[in-house]
Curated annotation (Swiss-Prot):
Top-level taxonomy: Bacteria, Pseudomonadati, Pseudomonadota, Gammaproteobacteria, Alteromonadales
Protein's recorded name: Cell division topological specificity factor
Record family assignment: Belongs to the MinE family.
InterPro entries: MinE, MinE_sf
UniProt KW Cell cycle keyword: yes
Disulfide pattern: none
UniProt keyword Cell division present: yes
HAMAP family per UniProt: MinE
Length: 92
């Protein structure tokens, strides 16, 4: 009976160890995803400043303007700016 208890306890211990390892791995993966997708604090203000400058010269709606900051190749940041321009919207 003691021999059987020894093997059963060992199997139960493996299950709890595996679940703890899985939980820790999920925490690490969530942390890595968060750090990769985190936008800098200055991005909303930068967006507003760029819109102010653009609106001095052309009519730009919020829907026709988008700005994204992506990480490429580790520590290279790429600022992507998309603006829909229409000929009839140019200001004189």
């Amino acid at each position: 009976m003691a021999l059987l208890d020894y093997f059963l306890r060992k199997k139960e211990k493996q299950v709890t160890t595996a679940s703890k390892a899985k939980e820790r791995l999920q925490i690490i993966v969530a942390h890595e995803r968060n750090s990769r997708n985190k936008q800098p604090d200055y991005l909303p203000q930068l967006t507003e400043d760029i819109l102010k400058v653009l609106r001095k010269y052309i009519k730009v709606s919020d829907e026709s303007f988008s700005i994204n900051l992506d990480k490429k190749d580790g520590d290279l940041n790429v600022l992507e700016l998309n603006i829909e321009l229409h000929d009839e919207q140019t200001a004189d």
